[in-house]
């Protein structure tokens, strides 16, 4: 009886132990942010800072080592030949050179120009060693084409500038001609107005020519037919504004002793010729 009871008790204890162990395992799998283990992990951040400094220091040493290796790198045969050639070209020939000694015997002096007149070159012709894979004359051809292209571009720019200057000059001439034409028309209207006033003062009721007087902008219906006839006569006149101004100016000076640019009616011809600069607008500038 006792053995059976103890056996059952042992089995119950074993089940309890297994259940308790299982519960502890489940609790361990869940994160406890208030546990010491989690706090210790957070506090382990500080030891990482020295590690970063060590990494940076290692990288700095590696870079210095690479620079030192680059400086101490053995030069290639091509680089050594280039250096020796440059040094040799920079140094002048000495008396130990047979060719130079022969030139000295012939009267040549160091630093003297070649040629009988002494107008030749002083420095030797530089060596241009070809290093590319292109054919002979290819680089010169490319250079010539580039120069031709540049020259063509310059010519186009020059022609464009000339065309722009010509267009600007033509515009200025047209503007000047327009201004001159407007000035002539203004002088002609002033002459017509003065001619009409002076003719009326002398009881001249009809102008010598229809265009000697200004035309009225508003006329009565009774004068419509006469206006049309006058317009036909006016249009038949084949005279420019300048020609009309010259004719009317001459009429005013001879008939009324008047100059529109002076704005004065003179006493006689002698007074007119003595005090008036001339019969044109340019004479009064």
Swiss-Prot record:
It is found in: Chromosome, Centromere, Kinetochore. Residues 51-87 form a coiled coil. The modification N6-acetyllysine is found at residue 149. InterPro entries: DUF4187, G_patch_dom, GPATCH11. SMART domains: DUF4187 (SM01173), G_patch (SM00443). GO terms for cellular component: kinetochore. Residues 218-235 have a biased composition (Acidic residues). PROSITE patterns: G_PATCH. Keywords: Acetylation, Centromere, Chromosome, Coiled coil, Kinetochore, Phosphoprotein. Residues 59-84, 218-237 are annotated as: Disordered. Its main location: nucleus. It comes from the Eukaryota. Residues 95-141 form the G-patch domain. The modification Phosphoserine is found at residue 141. The keyword Iron does not apply. GO terms for molecular function: nucleic acid binding. Belongs to the GPATCH11 family. This is G patch domain-containing protein 11. It comes from Homo sapiens (Human). The lineage of its organism: Eukaryota, Metazoa, Chordata, Craniata, Vertebrata.
